[in-house]
Amino acid sequence: AACIEWGKQTGEHIRAKALKSIVISDDAKARHIYTQVTRLEDVLELKEGRVLIVRAAMGEGKTQKIGRGFRDMAERNGQRFAALTHSSALVTELCKRLKLTPYKKVQGKLLEGAKAKEIYRFFGSCVHSIASPLIRSAFEACDVLFGDEAAQMLRSLESIYTQQTSTARDSTAQDVYDLLVKTIRTAPKVVLCDAGANDELIEWLESILGNEKIHIVETSKKSGDGINVTVHFANQQLQGEQAAITAIKKRLAEGKKIWISVGTVKLGHRIAQALRGCGHGAFIHA
């Protein structure tokens, strides 16, 4: 009986830990300002709170409706707008949607004789490069900071310290972290969006903002509504990967189609190698 009870408690602990990584808990909402909106455009009208966290389902248009909305508002008010995302691969599309100067074009524009005001007033970068001397002023002086896929952006900071991702050659991991914290603390408006905004993100913001209240905003629709998901746990990463590969092979043998999403190219290659001979497939890196 004691063993069964221990198993139940352990299961509940693991479940609670897993949920913490994918939701904003009621406890976190109670500590701050909380609003539920029916339309994303309503976020632009909210006046309470300097720092906004917007959690809305994937595909609802967070970048276009909220990011572009705050960018256009900044232009009307004569303000500077800077946007961040966690991956360099996403910056081009982000800048295209929000009408920003991409960080990779700074050097070329300076050589062409463009004025700093033209380059940096509306600016977009991946988080790893913000501390470069050519880029940092866009964030040091921005009036509105927009973070796209903010929870992933926070996790990507870890990859700098583990050297899975590099910073700009003229900056360090500590430079990046210090500037990000400084910008979030000092920008007159900070808007962080992510379908996966969670307690981890809230707690990190609390650690750098002290007693400042964050405005948490959610839409009623959640990513994955109507989809059933089974979560498996393993003590070791390789055990989890092997369990997943075994389950995938079983479904392929049954003639089913499988979509596999992974966090790193390395893991993707490893799974692709394990599935050789199991059927036809395509490896997509985006």
Segments predicted by a language model, with ranges:
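Conserved strand-helix element at the start of the C-terminal RecA-like helicase core
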Residues: 79-92, 197-201, 241-276
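Inter-Walker segment of RecA-like/P-loop motor cores
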Residues: 98-139, 286
